[in-house]
Every structure is written in C-alpha cells, then in structure tokens.
C-alpha cells in the first residue's frame, strides 16, 4: 500500500481566507475522486485529522480535503455568509469546490454544516457525486420537491442516542437514492463515539460510487 501525502493551506473564497487540510494517495497514485469534509460548531478540520478519517480516505485512494468553516477553527477571521441556522447560498460551497479544484466531490456534512451543504446538494444541476449527512441542521428548510430532485447517492448517518439524528432523518429520507447507517449507543458526533464503524460504513459507501 502506497503511503499518504498530507498538506495544509488556505484558499480564497468570496474574498475571504479559509484554512484546509488535505490528504492524498502517495507515490504518485491518482486519486479516485475527491471527498470534502465539513464539520460541526464545536469542531474543525482538525477533528478529521485526529480521528484518522483523512488518512483512511487517502489510504483507500481518495483525495480527502477538510476545510475550517468561516468563523471557526483556523478560519476564525472569515465572516460566515449567513447566521447560524440559516441556509447559505449554494454558490458558497460551489466556490470552495472550485477553489480546491475538487471536481464533483462527495460531501460529508455533520451538524452545523448542513446550512452550507443542503443548498449545494439541492441546487439545480448540482455536481455532487455523493452526500453523507451526519445529523445536519436545516433539514426542515428544504422542501419535498427539492429533496425529490436530488440524483446523488446519499448515506444518512446518525447515532441512535441523538434526537437530532432522528429529526433530520425524517426530512432526509425524502432523498430518493439513500441508505442509512444508524450507530447504536452513539450520540450526536457519532463518528467520534464509533470511529471504526464510521470508517467502515463510509468506505463501503464510497466503494459503491466508484
């Protein structure tokens, strides 16, 4: 198995600087496709590095990029494009994808980051390869017709001890091409409670998209 190359840096998005971390397959191996990892309000791209998710994804042949959302982590100086709990125009995440040259990515979106990812997911002509919502906020702000139009494959993930997970699932289940991973005994950041189950389920889902 080839090694993994890691780097970090900053991109300019709509006039603001956003920090990112990236892991790639080593040895000049071409990545299969890109995975963009977002995060919740108490977390940052460092969460995915410490958990080993970036490394595991790169090891499996994917380009894994985690950003720090505006106002959080090492993007603290950047101003959020909308108040917490309000939907951010899809153009914001489109600009992130463009700045990082990701191509059509899979987006992993826990909790707070739903305000960024859901408009991007449901935008007309969305270029998402896949979507992995982990109990995201704002699921009630998307209408049934917009959910029904989504063509991307979706893996809905949540912990069975997380009321928000069940609430968000009631909306997300309207996505036509979805499967569900419920983690027993896990809370809101279920990927932290059950990292092995998280990585196994995620890699299995990605394998099916290849």
From Swiss-Prot:
What does it catalyze?
A: L-lysyl-[protein] + acetyl-CoA = N(6)-acetyl-L-lysyl-[protein] + CoA + H(+)
Pfam assignment, any one: Abhydrolase_6
Q: What class of enzyme is it?
A: transferase
Please describe what this protein does: Acts as an atypical protein-lysine deacetylase in vitro. Catalyzes the deacetylation of lysine residues using CoA as substrate, generating acetyl-CoA and the free amine of protein-lysine residues. Additional experiments are however required to confirm the protein-lysine deacetylase activity in vivo. Has hydrolase activity towards various surrogate p-nitrophenyl (pNp) substrates, such as pNp-butyrate, pNp-acetate and pNp-octanoate in vitro, with a strong preference for pNp-acetate. May activate transcription.
The protein's Enzyme Commission number: 2.3.1.-
Spell out the Gene3D superfamilies in the cross-references.
Answer: alpha/beta hydrolase
The species this protein belongs to is Bos taurus
Q: Which family does it belong to?
A: Belongs to the AB hydrolase superfamily. ABHD14 family.
Write down which residues bear the modification named Phosphoserine.
91
Keywords attached to this Swiss-Prot or TrEMBL record, sorted alphabetically, are: Acyltransferase, Cytoplasm, Nucleus, Phosphoprotein, Transferase
Protein name, entry field = Putative protein-lysine deacylase ABHD14B
The UniProt record lists the keyword Isomerase? no
Q: Which gene encodes it?
A: ABHD14B
Assembly, in brief, is: May interact with TAF1.
UniProt keyword rRNA-binding, yes or no: no
